[in-house]
Amino acid sequence: MLIGLGAVVLAGCGSSKSSSSSPGATPAATTGAAASGSASAGPSDTSSPSAASTSKAVDKTAVTGAGKSDGKLTVGDLLPQTGSLATLGPPEFAGVGLAIKEINAAGGVLGKPVTEIPGDSGDATTDIATQTVNRELAAGADVIVGAASSAVSLTVIDKITNSGVIEFSPANTSTKFTTYPDKGLYFRTAPSDLLQGGVVGNVVVGDGHSKVAILALQDPYGTGLADQAEKAITGSGGQVVSKIIYDPTAASYDDVVGQTKAKNPDSILLIGFDESKKVIQSLVSAGIGPSKVPLYGVDGNISNTLGDGLPPGTLNGVKGTTPLTKLSSDFQAKLKSVDPKLRDFNYAGESYDAVTITALATEIAKTDLPTAVAKQISGVTKVGTPCMSFATCDKLVKAGTDIAYVGVAGALKLDDAGDPTSASYGVLTIGPDNKIVDSKTTYVTAGAQ
């Protein structure tokens, strides 16, 4: 997940909750960006952009008639308007909406306007995502942008790809997708936790800590990121004195916090979503809150909403990492033209890039047949003349020139698995007002240069 500073939120992960559309809502398809910008934010997703409870039965049945060509590119949204990751929804919807707006202003794709089908993903505790996917596949979506939560994506990826349609996530970070049997139809603009785990682990040890306690929610995102962070910490000379995987729906976290305190850590890494606030309150009550023991977070919980309702100063000094590219003031202004209420920009760039890359791949394929478009997606990001906008890149494509799209999230250089091989991360610091201090944000690049 990438972010645009001023309003940093967590990414590929969770945040606070809200509910602007009901699970059964079926808004009509719209052309352009209008439909996407007003999703309200809500609690983090207990299913993380990379996690999800996958214990319930998953419907893998293909939707009859999906995956066909009708001569126009149709984009379905599968982004969080409700659920534990709803805070990530607004910037992601805005990114999709802005991309479609600019693509259509440049003449559209295959000579026709791109159509958007709005849709809520909910979180992994509901069936909202399956309902949305069924509706969008039946409506002719060529690509479904989402989900933000890895756990949610794991519940619908088979249905989408079995239907011959592309799934393109702007925020999934679970390592599971790298080797998932997706028929070559799954892609993401957010980097795998293989990269973020190394970044956050190195930040903790780089700050001089050697006895680290890890608290992580139970789900693909939490456990995967915890494992990668542990490898980085121990590989850098530090020691993980405790690694506890907790239930994100627990009524109390006093027990796991007590176990953590008993190990006398000199720092704590908290990997979670909106439940992170309750964990922090337990840490404070136990005498090992951020003012006593340095606390670190990740894209699932580090945001400007994490401190809502907490006493001033509670989060002062808390640091965290998130996929993040420094968004220009111009791009932020464009996003706000789509959604004037935006507070954070996490994954807005990744969402914008997912749509733009798909549109360019469609132009190169000369058809909106998803299986044909998918074959062009990775190449769009790495093989040719660098270009940075749909309009500029499309002119090169129509002139017969190979392109290498460099997006808002950077030069992603997608590999054969559909994963970014290079990513920019922001190291964020929260100040005494419990908000992210933009001036203290630093950037780290991980992966291929």
Regions found by a protein language model. Give the residues of each.
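Extracytosolic ligand-binding ectodomains
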Residues: 1-449
